[in-house]
Amino acid sequence: MNVSVNIKNVTKEYRIYRTNKERMKDALIPKHKNKTFFALDDISLKAYEGDVIGLVGINGSGKSTLSNIIGGSLSPTVGKVDRNGEVSVIAISAGLSGQLTGIENIEFKMLCMGFKRKEIKAMTPKIIEFSELGEFIYQPVKKYSSGMRAKLGFSINITVNPDILVIDEALSVGDQTFAQKCLDKIYEFKEQNKTIFFVSHNLGQVRQFCTKIAWIEGGKLKDYGELDDVLPKYEAFLNDFKKKSKAEQKEFRNKLDESRFVIK
């Protein structure tokens, strides 16, 4: 089986500034030390054709940062991602302009993907039909609900038939009938040996469709492997975490975050 995505020692840092003065110092003074937050810290993993990888972890762990880097909308500070094929990212409102109508967004997004107008014209009816938006396709996206935006984004991205699909919580909004329709499409992609990264807090969906799990905790890759090996460990952790009081949960998160801040 061929490697479709190779994530090599990926780190994503953000400089933290309390004042504009600190920001100016950092810009003007070489090697000026400042507080830095590690959103991701030395992540490495390989995904193969046909892998459906669930990215799991509590809120703030770095899942969405990693999915954006895999998708190419965010660059790592250190490390690299090698992709063997075209990538599409599905997240709520990802790549959509609120000022444009739904049908204008279809054309705009597909032009950005490199499609010709003739190809876009041929695919647009399929996108509209899958989205189930009806006459709302002619309305500005800023008037859409989060579920409607997710429908449009998902419909565009699955119609262009990518080799690698990144889905970030896009199925967590909207009606369950459409969500199941999307999951059926994901299963089709899985059968076609496409590579899928699936970010979700719905462990039922993760268990149903994923073949592997990447558990992200505090910006680090805590575990990565086959679904049956990793998911039970994450579920046990999550059950223990949910039993904690709000104060204990906050303390746990704070300890994780403390390790992610450094002066450099």
UniProtKB/Swiss-Prot annotation:
Assembly notes: The complex is composed of two ATP-binding proteins (TagH) and two transmembrane proteins (TagG).
Topology class, membrane: Peripheral membrane protein
Domain (ABC transporter) ranges: 5-243
Keyword RNA-binding: no
Organism, scientific name: Staphylococcus aureus (strain NCTC 8325 / PS 47)
GO cellular component terms listed in the entry, alphabetical order: plasma membrane
Function: Part of the ABC transporter complex TagGH involved in teichoic acids export. Responsible for energy coupling to the transport system.
UniProt EC number: 7.5.2.4
UniProt keyword Ligase present: no
Name this protein carries in UniProt: Teichoic acids export ATP-binding protein TagH
Localization of this protein: Cell membrane
Residues where ATP binds: G57, I58, N59, G60, S61, G62, K63, S64
Family assignment from sequence similarity: Belongs to the ABC transporter superfamily. Teichoic acids exporter (TC 3.A.1.104.1) family.
SUPFAM superfamilies in the record: P-loop containing nucleoside triphosphate hydrolases
Entries under SMART domains matching the protein: AAA
GO molecular function: ABC-type teichoic acid transporter activity; ATP binding; ATP hydrolysis activity
Keywords: ATP-binding, Cell membrane, Membrane, Nucleotide-binding, Translocase, Transport
Catalysed reactions, semicolon-separated: ATP + H2O + teichoic acidSide 1 = ADP + phosphate + teichoic acidSide 2
Lineage top rank: taxon: Bacteria
